[in-house]
Amino acid sequence: MDRLKLYFSVFVLSFFIVSVSSSDVNDGDDLVIRQVVGGAEPQVLTSEDHFSLFKRKFGKVYASNEEHDYRFSVFKANLRRARRHQKLDPSATHGVTQFSDLTRSEFRKKHLGVRSGFKLPKDANKAPILPTENLPEDFDWRDHGAVTPVKNQGSCGSCWSFSATGALEGANFLATGKLVSLSEQQLVDCDHECDPEEADSCDSGCNGGLMNSAFEYTLKTGGLMKEEDYPYTGKDGKTCKLDKSKIVASVSNFSVISIDEEQIAANLVKNGPLAVAINAGYMQTYIGGVSCPYICTRRLNHGVLLVGYGAAGYAPARFKEKPYWIIKNSWGETWGENGFYKICKGRNICGVDSMVSTVAATVSTTAH
C-alpha cells in the first residue's frame, strides 16, 4: 500500500491540525502541518498530501484542470485558516472538513442561511420565567428519544428549516410520545412568511429564512407533513406540494427565550430541543471538542438545534472544567462529532444565546 493509501486509512477516523508557530509557514510557501495518525507520532504531510486525502475522502471531482487548481488554492487558504482557528479556539480541534475547498462566501451561501432580523411574528410570545434551582447538572434530549438522526441540508441555505423542524419534532415527541421526522422541504417550498416590519425579509427556501417565521407559517397553515411524505431535495421547489390531509405535527404556540443561560437551560429541559441561531465562523473547520474561541462575532448566520448541555467538557489552561451546550447541526454525520457541535456556555459565545425559541405542539386531528 503506498504512503497516501496508508495515511488515508486512518484519515477517515482522525484528521486534525495541531498548533504550529506562525514562523513555520510563509504565505508563498507550501503549507506543512502535522497530522495525528492513529495515536502514533504526528506525521508531516504537505498541502498536496492533504488535498489528495481530502479529495478521496469526500469524493471530490473537478470539471477541469483550472477548477482543480483553483480549488487547491482555496484549500490551502483554508488550511491556514484552520491553523488560525486552532490557535484562537484551542479547546476544540480544527482541520480539514468537507467544506475545505469552499471560499467563505461560497460556504455562507450554500451551507448557512439565517436571515438577519429580530422582530417577532405576531403570534410569538415571550417565554415565561421558569424556576432554575433544580436543573440537572447534565442533560441531553438524545438520551430521551426526542431527537431524530442528523440530516443534511446539502448546498442549500435552508438551515433555518432544519432548526425549526428539529424543535417541532422534539415538541411533537413530548406531546404524542412518538418521534416523527418532519419535512424541511415543505418549509423550503411553501413558507414565504415575512418579517412583520420588513416586508422584503421573508423566508425564501435555499436563500435563507428565520425559525420564528417558520413557526408562524406552521401555526397558520396547520402543521408539517412527514419527511417521507414530502422528502427533502435540497433545491427550491417551483410549487408547494402541501397535502393538509397528511399533516402530522402542529404548532400550538411558540416563544422567544431571554438571553439568560439558566432560562435557556430550563426551557430546554422542560419544553424540548430549542431552535437557536449562531455565528458559524468556526464551524467550517470544526472537527470535534468544545469550541470556545477567544474571539467570535455575534452576527448570527446559521440555524441549529440545541439538544442538551454538559457540566464539564473542557478545561482551559490552569482553570477547572467548563460547561458547554450540545448542538445538532444539519451538515450530515461526517461533519463534527457525528453531526453534532459543542460550544462553551457562559459568555454568549458566537451569539449562541441571542436568538433562542421554544415551540409547543398539539396532536393533529388529521395525523396518519
Swiss-Prot record:
Induction: By high salt conditions. Induced by drought stress. CDD domains: Peptidase_C1A. Transmembrane segments: none annotated. Glycans are attached at residue 253. Residues 23-134 form a propeptide. Residues 1-22 form the signal peptide. InterPro entries: Papain-like_cys_pep_sf (IPR038765), Pept_asp_AS (IPR025661), Pept_cys_AS (IPR000169), Pept_his_AS (IPR025660), Peptidase_C1A (IPR013128), Peptidase_C1A_C (IPR000668), Peptidase_C1A_papain-like (IPR039417), Prot_inhib_I29 (IPR013201). GO terms for biological process: defense response to bacterium; proteolysis; response to osmotic stress; response to salt stress. It is found in: Lytic vacuole; Nucleus. SMART domains: Inhibitor_I29, Pept_C1. PANTHER family: CYSTEINE PROTEASE FAMILY C1-RELATED. Probable thiol protease. Required for RRS1-mediated resistance against Ralstonia solanacearum. Plays a crucial role as host factor for PopP2-triggered RRS1-mediated resistance. Interacts with the R.solanacearum type III effector PopP2 to form a nuclear complex that is required for activation of the RRS1-mediated resistance response. This is Cysteine protease RD19A. It comes from Arabidopsis thaliana. The lineage of its organism: Eukaryota, Viridiplantae, Streptophyta, Embryophyta, Tracheophyta.
